[in-house]
């Protein structure tokens, strides 16, 4: 529903190495743009994004806080991403698996960016938040009905996560805020 073979996705680097493998398996080209250590790995300038956007560009992937750098995108950076996604009709795939690991600054979810509802696909997992690495239990969250419908078709064709992971996941989401 979001990407087809031959499409491109922009990712600020350094990035989670598996994004490259996932894209390759789908026939999608990763177009990296470099974030710099001198800026603490802040979001590269929007002009860098503009330079690499083509008619094949369909999405931007971010991870905030970033894996592997730990950089937390600011509200201003998230708003800049919103503007470019709307301007070019791009999806914003937001990996928010590390959202509990914010030590400085305000965590801003892509789902909370007004006007971006139809462009955001949030990816999350219990493995980081609840120290359940290996459980492979997560979520894809979107308000875009076409994306949701496509995900549900895929979900119907896929086997479920292991029973123990499901039981553990259900118990984990009921933990009190004091857990964190």
Predicted regions and their residues:
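Phosphate-binding glycine-rich loop
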Residues: 1-8
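A short helix->loop->beta-strand "cap" motif at the edges of active sites that frequently abuts
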Residues: 7, 28, 87-91, 116-118
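Short beta->alpha connector loops at strand-helix junctions that form conserved
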Residues: 13, 32-37
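Hydrophobic/aromatic ligand-binding patch that stacks against planar heteroaromatic rings
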Residues: 21-23, 84
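A short helix-loop-beta submotif of the ANL/AMP-binding
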Residues: 25-31
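Active-site phosphate-binding strand-loop segment of PLP-dependent enzymes
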Residues: 35-104
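PLP-dependent aminotransferase class I/II
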Residues: 119-180
């Amino acid at each position: 529903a979001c990407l087809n073979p031959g499409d491109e996705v922009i990712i600020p680097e350094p990035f989670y190495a598996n994004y490259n493998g996932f894209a390759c398996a789908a026939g999608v080209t990763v177009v990296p743009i470099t974030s710099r250590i001198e800026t603490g790995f802040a979001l590269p300038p929007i002009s860098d994004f503009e330079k690499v956007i083509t008619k094949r560009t369909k999405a931007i992937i971010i991870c905030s806080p970033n894996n592997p750098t730990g950089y937390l995108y600011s509200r201003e950076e998230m708003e800049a991403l919103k503007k470019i996604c709307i301007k070019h009709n791009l999806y914003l795939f937001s990996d928010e698996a590390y959202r509990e690991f914010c030590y400085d600054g305000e965590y801003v979810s892509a789902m909370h960016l007004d006007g971006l509802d139809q462009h955001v696909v949030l990816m999350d997992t219990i493995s980081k938040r609840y120290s359940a690495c290996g459980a492979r239990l997560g979520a894809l969250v979107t308000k875009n009905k076409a994306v949701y419908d496509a995900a549900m078709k895929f979900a119907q064709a896929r086997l479920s996560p292991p029973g123990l992971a499901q039981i553990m996941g259900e118990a984990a989401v009921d933990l009190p805020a004091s857990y964190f």
